């Protein structure tokens, strides 16, 4: 049974001053109502709470059987009957119909208007005749594009809205019959059309398909009947033949109820064929279709009900558009709308069904009516249903489904929305005598009432005969009495904000007794406001701000309700409070702190919200009183979370004595841990008790302390207003235990508790350095990263950081601001990325007796990195410019880099010029294997040439030449050796080497 709330969604009402009893009526956009009676259509102006006034009237060809209005194109379309023939006509430019006798132009669909006649069509109403080969039964206009769908027996005809461009200033509305949808064995009672989605309904069947453009699966489209299951088709034909045979014996064959969703609906047995009738084949709008839903109902034979009690009614497709898809000035609404979600509603007399049909097809809600319904109309906020004497208002879940389509963050810790599956309810059952028809537009409900004498059946028929397919209606005999009275009412629905406030007031009756009932009603209020915000085209100026405020307030109310829950839904406290815009202090101020039976109980919802809020760095600091209450709350509900809570920046103002007392209680209660120890050490530091701090820090090994910091990073690092802020404990460790601090931050990075850039910023802020200055502690951290070989660290980026810093210090002769934690020897022994420094490098460095010892470590680390196996030498060359080759340090680095790039000849030239004593060690280390020829091709000629020139380095060159000749004499044959010797040399100098080379072969 649907829950009923006695609310007041309906406001004032007025009577429409029409002269004849309406046959049909419908809304006309934002400000008009059309009423068809006899052979005339009257248009009434409807604006807000003002009285309904006649606007214009125009004659029709005959009695109006169906009437529909399209906001896109601003036209009215009608099915009219005259002399037992039906006609389809569209009334365009009706707003220019000033008097009933004003001239009207009539033209056929697709008729080109000549220039001289265009002025007449611009300034007066004109009618478009749309001939059909079969009688039209029902019509529907696309609310987005303005296309017209017409239902006929076994087929649907689609007329596309288009415009004939007469000149630059004027275009004429027209239609083109673009598509025929053949559907075998169905007589449509109602159709609905929206942006390619087609819904068709017979007495007991509903079919929904989606028309699609472009070749299916990239293939050329051939128009032929859509293949259906042959077995099902044969079964259907067999049943049809059996029915014809058996009905003569008073047997009734009823098909089973059936629901097919998605691709399965192809098995419905209905043959669907598309026939394109557009003029231009390349501009074909729809070329194939997709089955979405098929549902078939069957009468309950055991109930012996009349046939009218088993007929479907009120088929409707309801679109919901993207929020903010309309232009700010409200113009070109139909062109600017972007479909977000689409819903389909249809109803039996006692049950209504609401489906979602866009991305997935699923049944959202089932409506059980307390009495037989006659008609229903669906809006984004409500479902309005009329029975013979009641107007019923039910809630819907359209906005809940659309919100999830629109926002990917829905149903997360950031945002929430009441579930689509939540039970619907009735807000109001309003008494109206003799209700016959209903329609809805904007914030108005139009009702037709007629008090008729009681209908008397002509004769009593057997239940079997009433269910016969040949006799689907009951003949009613009406006594020849005077026509009963009738009225056409406009019922104004109250504003969403006003109804929302009433629902909130109503929910207070359940607040302390039935939390779930309170949540249900507040959820309905929330969805009401959300739906109103989605339907931006219906909002009055200034109403949106009021709705947004109501939306936030409703989120706060829902947060309050869920905070009192201790169930699986208590986690919804967090997103609702977030959406409410309430601060944590404001939420705590709304909390009931009363104590019952001497025990304070805190529900899981509130604990969940506070816990997450304290973790999310909200830049909100609680005052001392609220902070103490929060600690007390967690000590009672979740004592293990107390250390984490105390580390939150929001708890900055808590009294350290209060914090320490709760931490000591944890020790005595058996909750002692490394995290409790570190938190006590941090609190002791705030209290200024250094002895207690030292004792706590000494109670565990350094490895355990690192594990504790990994469990709670906020002991070291906090964020305030988006900026990283080191804690007081981190500042203290920088001075007393920098190694522990670096190891802890490295552990945080290794466990994904802090990013690379965040860690760099932390050390810069910790050491009070600006963005361009690199403290030694950060260099220590980079070196520790290399040693640890973290998988997520980009090696070359880390190499670049370190080498840049080493080079900068060497070029500026800038010593580290603190003592490095590791020496170059430590790094070489601990890390494979730091290589052994080449022996000849030591010779180069030792040649400078005036070398500055303050930066020897930086030079050694840089040389070691360059000598390592992982370093990309080419990437560092552009950054070597500040390190001049004029210094021995710069010389060693430049020669090292060129050596790694295999520029050996250039390196030999540099060393011969700058440091000849290092040439032989260099050659011994580098000139091997394929480079061994450089001994006699490069080094030997260069030394001979420099010896000829003499100078201060003569003796160094001479000793180097002797070493070189010794190596060459071993490597070359005598003939080759003689060829590489200089022609003008002293024979006595080279003779020993020649003799050694000549004896080398016999000796071996």
From Swiss-Prot:
GO CC aspect terms: BLOC-2 complex; cytoplasm; cytosol; early endosome
- Report the locations given in the UniProt record: Cytoplasm; Cytoplasm, Cytosol
The entry's keywords? Albinism, Cytoplasm, Disease variant, Hermansky-Pudlak syndrome
Q: Which GO terms describe its biological process?
A: intracellular transport; melanosome assembly; pigmentation; platelet dense granule organization
Distribution of this protein across tissues and organs: Widely expressed. Higher levels of expression are observed in kidney, liver and placenta.
Q: Which disease relates to this protein according to its record?
A: Hermansky-Pudlak syndrome 3: A form of Hermansky-Pudlak syndrome, a genetically heterogeneous autosomal recessive disorder characterized by oculocutaneous albinism, bleeding due to platelet storage pool deficiency, and lysosomal storage defects. This syndrome results from defects of diverse cytoplasmic organelles including melanosomes, platelet dense granules and lysosomes. Ceroid storage in the lungs is associated with pulmonary fibrosis, a common cause of premature death in individuals with HPS.
Q: State the protein's name.
A: BLOC-2 complex member HPS3
- The species this protein belongs to is Homo sapiens
The primary gene name is HPS3
């Amino acid at each position: 049974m649907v829950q009923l709330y006695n609310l007041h969604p309906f406001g004032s009402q007025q009577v429409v001053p029409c002269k004849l009893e309406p046959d049909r009526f419908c809304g006309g956009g934002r400000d008009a109502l059309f009423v068809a009676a006899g052979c005339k259509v009257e248009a009434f102006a409807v604006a807000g709470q003002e009285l309904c006034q006649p606007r214009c009237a125009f004659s029709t060809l005959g009695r109006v059987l169906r009437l529909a209005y399209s906001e896109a194109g601003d036209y009215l379309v009608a099915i009219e009957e005259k002399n037992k023939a039906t006609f389809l006509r569209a009334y365009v430019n009706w707003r220019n119909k000033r008097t009933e006798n004003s001239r009207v132009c009539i033209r056929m669909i697709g008729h080109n208007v000549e220039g001289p006649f265009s002025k007449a069509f611009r300034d007066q109403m004109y009618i478009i005749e749309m001939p059909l080969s079969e009688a039209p039964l029902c019509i529907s206009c696309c609310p987005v594009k303005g296309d017209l769908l017409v239902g006929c027996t076994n087929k649907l005809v689609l007329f596309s809205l288009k415009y004939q461009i007469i000149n630059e200033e004027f275009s004429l509305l027209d239609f083109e019959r673009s598509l025929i949808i053949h559907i075998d064995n169905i007589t449509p009672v109602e159709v609905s059309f929206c942006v390619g989605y087609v819904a068709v309904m017979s007495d007991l069947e509903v079919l929904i398909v989606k028309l699609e453009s472009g070749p299916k699966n990239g293939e050329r489209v051939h128009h032929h009947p859509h293949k259906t299951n042959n077995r099902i088709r044969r079964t259907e034909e067999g049943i049809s033949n059996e029915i014809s045979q058996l009905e003569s014996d008073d047997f009734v064959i009823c098909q089973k109820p059936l629901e097919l969703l998605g691709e399965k609906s192809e098995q419905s047995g209905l043959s669907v064929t598309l026939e394109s009738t557009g003029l231009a084949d390349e501009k074909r709008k729809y070329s194939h279709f997709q089955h979405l839903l098929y549902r078939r109902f069957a009468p309950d034979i055991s109930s012996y009900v009349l046939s009218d009690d088993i007929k479907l009614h009120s088929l409707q497709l309801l679109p919901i558009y993207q929020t903010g898809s309309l232009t700010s000035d409200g113009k070109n609404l139909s062109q600017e709308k972007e479909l977000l979600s689409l819903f389909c509603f249809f109803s039996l007399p006692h049950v209504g069904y609401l489906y979602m049909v866009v991305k997935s097809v699923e049944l959202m809600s089932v409506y059980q009516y307390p009495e037989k319904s006659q008609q229903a109309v669906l809006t984004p906020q409500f479902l309005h249903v009329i029975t013979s004497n009641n107007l019923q208002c039910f809630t819907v879940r359209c906005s809940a489904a659309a919100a999830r389509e629109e926002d990917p963050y829905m149903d997360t810790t950031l945002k929430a929305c009441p579930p689509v599956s939540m039970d619907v309810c009735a807000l109001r059952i309003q008494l109206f005598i003799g209700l016959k028809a209903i329609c809805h537009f904007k914030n108005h409900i139009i009702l037709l009432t007629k008090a008729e004498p009681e209908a008397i059946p002509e004769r009593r028929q057997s239940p079997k005969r009433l269910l016969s397919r040949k006799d689907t209606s009951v003949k009613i005999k009406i006594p020849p009495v005077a026509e009963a009275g009738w009225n056409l009412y406009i019922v104004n629905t109250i504003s969403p904000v006003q109804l929302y406030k009433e629902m909130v007031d109503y929910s207070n009756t359940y607040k302390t007794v039935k939390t779930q009932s309170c949540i249900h009603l507040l959820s309905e209020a929330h969805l009401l406001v959300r739906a109103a915000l989605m339907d931006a085209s219906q909002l009055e100026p200034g109403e949106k701000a009021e709705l947004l405020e109501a939306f936030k307030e409703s989120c706060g109310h829902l947060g309050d309700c869920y905070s009192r829950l201790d169930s699986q839904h208590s986690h919804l406290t967090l997103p609702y409070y977030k959406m409410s815009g309430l601060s944590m202090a404001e939420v705590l101020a709304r909390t009931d702190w009363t104590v019952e039976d001497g025990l304070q109980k805190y529900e899981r919802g509130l604990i969940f919200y506070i816990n997450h809020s304290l973790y999310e760095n909200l830049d909100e600091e609680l005052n001392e009183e609220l902070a103490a209450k929060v600690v007390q709350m967690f000590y009672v509900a979740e004592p293990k979370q107390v250390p984490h809570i105390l580390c939150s920046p929001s708890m900055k103002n808590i009294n350290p004595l209060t914090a320490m007392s709760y931490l000591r209680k944890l020790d005595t209660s058996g909750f002692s841990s490394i995290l409790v120890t570190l938190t006590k050490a941090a609190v002791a530091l705030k209290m200024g008790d250094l002895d207690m701090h030292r004792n706590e820090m000494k109670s565990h090994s350094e490895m355990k302390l690192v594990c504790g910091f990994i469990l709670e990073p906020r002991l070291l690092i906090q964020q305030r207003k988006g900026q990283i802020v080191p804690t007081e404990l981190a500042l203290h460790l920088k001075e007393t235990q920098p190694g522990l601090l670096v190891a802890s931050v490295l552990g945080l990075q290794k466990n994904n508790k802090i990013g690379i850039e965040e860690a760099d910023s932390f050390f810069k802020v910790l050491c009070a350095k600006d963005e361009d200055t690199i403290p030694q502690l950060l260099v220590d951290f980079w070196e520790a990263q290399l040693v640890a070989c973290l998988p997520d660290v980009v090696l070359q980026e880390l190499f670049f950081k370190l080498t840049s810093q080493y080079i900068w210090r060497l070029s500026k002769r800038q010593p580290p601001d603190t003592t490095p934690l590791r020496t170059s020897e430590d790094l070489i022994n601990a890390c494979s990325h730091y290589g052994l420094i080449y022996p000849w490098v030591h010779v180069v460095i030792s040649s400078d007796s005036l070398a500055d010892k303050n930066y020897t470590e930086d030079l050694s680390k840089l040389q070691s990195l360059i000598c390592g196996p992982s370093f990309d030498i080419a990437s560092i060359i552009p950054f070597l410019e500040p390190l001049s080759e004029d210094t021995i340090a710069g010389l060693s680095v430049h020669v090292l880099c060129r050596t790694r790039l295999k520029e050996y000849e250039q390196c030999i030239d540099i060393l011969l010029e700058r440091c000849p004593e290092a040439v032989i060690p260099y050659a011994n280390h580098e000139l091997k294997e394929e480079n061994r020829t450089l001994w006699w091709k490069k080094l030997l000629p260069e030394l001979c040439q420099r010896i000829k020139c003499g100078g201060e380095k003569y003796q160094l060159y001479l000793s180097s030449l002797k070493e070189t000749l010794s190596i060459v004499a071993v490597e070359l044959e005598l003939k080759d050796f003689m060829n590489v010797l200089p022609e003008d040399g002293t024979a006595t100098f080279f003779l020993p080497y020649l003799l050694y080379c000549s004896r080398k072969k016999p000796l071996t």
